[in-house]
Amino acid sequence: EEMKIQAMKINTWGKNVYVKVPVANSKGKFMGKIIKELNNKNIKLNITAVYNAKQTEKILKLINKKTKVIISIFAGRAGDTGKDPVPEFSKSINLAKRYKNVEILWASVREPYNYLQAKQLGCHIITVPPAIIEKIENFGKSFDQLTKETVKAFLVDSKKSNFKI
């Protein structure tokens, strides 16, 4: 009930505001009731802490096809467990194609290559931290160029430690 009250208040902040709701509570219980209720009140939602296409499918079964919804799938955290998030994104994006009001967000970026993965899959949104954006600027460099830059960095490090290369 408290989440509903907060969501209603946040929704008054502006037309471009999305209310963030976790897909499940801290006990792992699916938050379908509140998702459906807020969606039916035309409150834009960012449903977060999603990890798989089954969760995406459960969300899609509840929502209408007019109120905007973002489904945030945590790719980096999934990858941290040794699981490839790409198949779950691919399935989720395909499921969401029937809903013009739904966007899939690639959350929890860990490396620049995630940007390319999200782009290749047709992900609608990707949240990229500044440190990763800086690394994306390396895209297009040749391996020979990277070798030269790496060895130059080794040279700088060796001079700092009074060693010679």
Regions found by a protein language model. Name each.
Residues 1-37, 41, 75-78:
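Active-site beta->alpha loop and helix N-cap motifs at the rims of alpha/beta catalytic domains
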Residues 5, 12, 159, 163-165:
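Mobile acidic interaction elements
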